[in-house]
Amino acid sequence: MTKTLKRPEVLSPAGTLEKLKVAVQYGADAVFIGGQAYGLRSRAGNFTFEQMEEGVQFAAKYGAKVYVAANMVMHEGNEAGAGEWFRKLRDIGIAAVIVSDPALIMIVATEAPGLEIHLSTQASATNYETLEFWKELGLTRVVLAREVSMEELAEIRKRTDVEIEAFVHGAMCISYSGRCTLSNHMSMRDANRGGCSQSCRWKYDLYDMPFGKERKSLKGEIPEEFSMSAVDMSMIDHIPDMIENGVDSLKIEGRMKSIHYVSTVTNCYKAAVDAYLESPEKFEAIKQDLVDEMWKVAQRELATGFYYGIPSENEQLFGARRKIPEYKFVAEVVSYDDAAQTATIRQRNAINEGDQVEFYGPGFRHFETYIEDLHDAKGNKIDRAPNPMELLTIKVPQPVQSGDMVRALKEGLINFYKEDGTSVTVRA
């Protein structure tokens, strides 16, 4: 008998209303955002109630949901006004809140009935008994701790019917399930109440301090300054394991990341899910393309976290970043004129005549070309556009759509050959 596979939700991050709309347009089945209170990303451009309402209405047009992360650790006095705040979320149409502190869970359950509760990864759920415990308290979904292995995940799925949400992409915290106090000590900002300063990613000098002896600087003896953060997670080539093991929601980290990141990563995971559910062969055919696409927005090296064993020193960033993005985000498409074969684009980074670029859009559409026939908003021919947010027009040989993105290779020179056999040297 053929096993029926459940389609997992692709859950994308959205730090702003713009990012929410981009995530939904690029295939997210749901997005998670932060509000003005109770979250862990105080610098993520969190949503007002009005923005939430607009986001919920926009997502609904695409059949997508909006969740709100409210996963801070509560201290005495923080609960004031919480009931009213959560009732407002419920009335706006927020599909669920992501919570870790039992105090907030109790407040939501008793003072905002009808608002679905998901357990945050901050609660460190690592076994099926924990999921069953939270189920008894009315929670419908649990975000597993990042420290759970694939073998453990499979066993949890067999023994509980609670919805499982699992991280598949993004930054990894050096502390257990993100519960860290390093930021408190280094910058007097409480990471568990929305103030993480990412102290683990700072550069440090190391000293050898044998007992009873004078400390000795190791500067010069080690190749780079020390940092203690992890590489990023990417499970794009292991999506079959996630689907086969019955994960209900594939979570992408990154509410503070750019629309370039959100669009690219969402696009890839949606394509991966669609391909595998069509056939394993279809997934294998595009797998390397998906992996290559991820490197275009990577800020650090990529690994699989704890899913296939305890991370080694190769999954830690003990020194300088060893890989950098090959591409930079330069523009988004506003409109396309089929007759003239020109696109109006809103610039995000400097663009030059002759730059080699790649257009990409929802549905894993992409093609490469180069910047040709560059004009400003007044119709003047220009060679360079250095100022962000300008409206520009360029010649584009293939049709593109509003909301498509444009990125460029970052450095170097490439000889680009046109169809007529002539070549131009472009910055890459």
Model-based region annotation:
Residues 42-46:
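Conserved non-cysteine loop/helix-boundary elements of the Radical SAM core domain that shape
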Residues 80, 114-115, 119-128:
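Gly/Gly-Pro- and Ser/Thr-rich, intrinsically disordered tail segments characteristic of DNA damage-repair
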Residues 103-104:
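Alpha-helix capping/helix-boundary segments
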